Amino acid sequence: MSQGFRTDIQALRGLAVSLVLFYHAGFDFLGAGFLGVDVFFVISGFLITDMVRKEVEAGRFSFKTFYFRRAKRLLPAAYATFLASAVVAPFALNAQELQDFIKQVWGAVTFSANLVLLMQTGYFSGAADLKPLLHTWSLSIEEQYYLLLPAFLAFTPRRYWVPGGVLMFVASLGMCLGLQSFKPTATFYLLPTRGWELGVGSMIALMPGLMLRLQPVLAALFWPAVAVLAVIPVFPTGLPHPGLDALLVCLATAVVIARRHPLLERALVSRALARVGDVSYSLYLAHWPPFAFLKNASVSTVTPLQSLLTLMVGIGLGLLLYRCVEMPTRRWQPQPSRGFAFGTFVTSCCVIRSEERRVGK
């Protein structure tokens, strides 16, 4: 279960972001393309847990190094997206929408966008389509998970990792299923009711020996898991989300990751999806604001042609973000320092504050 570069995981990323992009573009054949986010959650839980577990076991884990790497990997492209959206927002949003947008930016910068959006709207409501940073809710959940997971692994004795992980997984899933009927919006947006999805990935990373022993079982489950990932986004269960559909997709994703089928390393479709997966983070960041700004500017229903053109614009912006921001900052190799994260945060706060003053005039 080595982390390394894995074509199969990159292909899963490519599938996930494709589902989300086509769903947001309004393609009718993807009634549940939003499940791509659930695939992302499992992948993130697996990769982060696998990395931290190995470093803790080797006695070389450092909180400073971990959070520096996360900041360098995630923040530049995200903050570039927030800044570009802030430039466009005054020309596309009315006064109230602009005030809401500024709150969304504050939430995204402070890893609490899911909480801000919970106070503003439900994800599936019509008003949600008008929010340029709606998609940052999932990034905030992942970042909140990254704040908690390393502490759990670093300070908990190894013999309690799996029992503790199972307990938290069951508690989170139970809260999700139990609260879905009563608090659907909160269930959608909050880490306690979404953490189990990242926990699925974490659990297979915490049990590499068991995953090896279960390879015959995983081999039998592999193609049914692939079928789940192919079918459910097209033919959704119609049940409340997150619920049974998310559980099936998360478990299917976990099976594919744990099985590591050699076919996914060689198949042409996997390699094509892996290329998309390489740029999935920038595509995810850049694709949604154009849709939101289009819907804010439209006086009538957005046409399929407009959606297709907007999707192409979003993809183009995502590729530009990848080439000009994400890749250069990933190659940058400074020494970890508190000043990097603090300086980035302060700069972002100054930009947001400047935008607030401009709105207030």
Language model features: what each stretch is:
Residues 248, 356-361:
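Conserved small/polar residues in nucleotide/adenosyl-binding loops
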Residues 1-337, 348:
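Membrane-interface helix/loop caps of multi-pass membrane proteins
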